[in-house]
């Protein structure tokens, strides 16, 4: 999970220099997208392992 959080925090810190609301929205959006990608990767990995047994 740490590998997902580091880019999210970095992006939100960049936008924090411009606007706090923009930084918060960016943090939430990037976190949601990366969570979906991570969940999908775990599901595909489980399916791959199931099919190759």
Curated annotation (Swiss-Prot):
Keyword set, alphabetical order: Membrane, Transmembrane, Transmembrane helix
A GO term from the CC aspect: membrane
Transmembrane residue ranges: 24-44
InterPro entries associated with the record: Prd_NiFe_hyd_3_EhaE
Compartment(s) where it occurs, according to its Swiss-Prot or TrEMBL record: Membrane
Superkingdom classification of source: Archaea
Membrane topology: Single-pass membrane protein
The protein, known as: Uncharacterized protein MJ0525
Species this protein is from: Methanocaldococcus jannaschii (strain ATCC 43067 / DSM 2661 / JAL-1 / JCM 10045 / NBRC 100440)
